[in-house]
Amino acid sequence: MRLIENWFSERYSDNLQLSFRVQDQLLSVKTDYQRIDLFNTYDFGKLLSIDGTVQLTEKDEYIYHEMITMVPYYCTAKSDSALIIGGGDGGAAKRLIDLGIKRIVNVEIDQNVVEISRKYFPELADSFNNKNVELIIGDGIKYVKDTDESFDLIIIDSTDPVGPAEGLFNKSFYENARARLSDDGIIVTQSGSPYYQPEALKMATKGMLDVFSNVRTYIAFIPTYPSGLWSFTMASKSEIMQRKDNIIPGRYFNEDVLKGSFYLPEFVKNIIKSI
């Protein structure tokens, strides 16, 4: 991360970065787990960065949060309960509430993410006050290993597979998660930019393929993430089928997006085939 002459830049490589002109920096804090920065930008409103990478902005957060929740929701036979690992901003929980999920457990490792989101992104973090949401501050990997509860959806709303999130992308975690899924349940994770982070997509896909027989990747356009092309990878013990019931659109998500998001560019298919 760089902040030079009122520009915040996320570096993708030594030769490439995406820069946002900022009005001011609202905070910078080093927690026990990560560095959190918050900026007020001209074009995207408030921007939350963790360890130098963009996590969300006011202007486009809805795309990521709709796609990580609504796609798996409409690919399950039923969705009465959900577990979110990460998601300390509350955006994923908010979408699941809107979808009518009756029980949502949200496990976030860093209390600071929740507190910052409550203050600066209340439209998202107010979801934690909903009666259907149980917020747990703790290690999601340990929670999945220790709990006896099963869920129809498990959503891995984490940072990239480094630091505290690294353990969310391996076979051991997926084995424990499989035991926590209902028979027709789905687990989904963000799996990075296929263009700039193919290893993240490979890591998520391989980890799931080692444990699940049904694994699918889908994509979305998120303008503030590397390249704008972002991948998500889901898995189930059962066949993954799109439901036939009435699909309620979001601001980005709709019935066409649900179908089209699974049509992958050839280079993305080749990344997956190379595993």
Curated annotation (Swiss-Prot):
Residues 5-237 form the PABS domain. The active site is at 157 (proton acceptor). Its EC number is 2.5.1.16. The keyword Glycosyltransferase does not apply. The keyword Transferase applies. Keywords: Cytoplasm, Polyamine biosynthesis, Spermidine biosynthesis, Transferase. Catalyzes the irreversible transfer of a propylamine group from the amino donor S-adenosylmethioninamine (decarboxy-AdoMet) to putrescine (1,4-diaminobutane) to yield spermidine. This is Polyamine aminopropyltransferase. PROSITE patterns: PABS_2. S-methyl-5'-thioadenosine binds at residues 34, 108, 139-140, 164.
